[in-house]
C-alpha cells in the first residue's frame, strides 16, 4: 500500500503536534509519527505536568492556526515578569508589570498536558 503525504513529522510531542496542526491548517496533507504510544491519561507515567509560558508572538500563532479558542480557558495570563539574579551573594530581583507597557499580558502560562489535549482535539 502506498500513501502520499505532503509532510511527514517525526515526533508527537508538543512541537511535532503543533507543526502538524499548522501545516494541516495551511492545507497540507500531514502525517505525524512517534515511536511511543501516546499518554492519554494525566495520571499515567510519562504525562507531562509541567507548564510553558507562551508570549505574545506565540499567542498570535496559536490564534492563527485555530488552537487558542481550545486553550484560552485553561491558560493563566502572565501579568508580572520577575527576573532573579541568584549568582551574586545578595539575591537581586526585579519585577516588570505588563500594564506598564500594554493592556495585554506578557503572555500566558499553559499546562503542557492541556496544550497536548488541545492539539489532539484540533487534529481530530
Which residues fall in each region the model found?
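Glycine-rich FAD pyrophosphate-binding loop
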Residues: 24-48
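Short glycine-enriched, charge-decorated loop/helix-capping segments at active-site entrances
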Residues: 44-50, 101, 105
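N-terminal FAD cofactor-binding segment of flavoenzymes
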Residues: 46-87
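Short glycine-/small-residue-rich flexible loop motifs, especially phosphate/cofactor-binding loops
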Residues: 20, 59, 63, 120
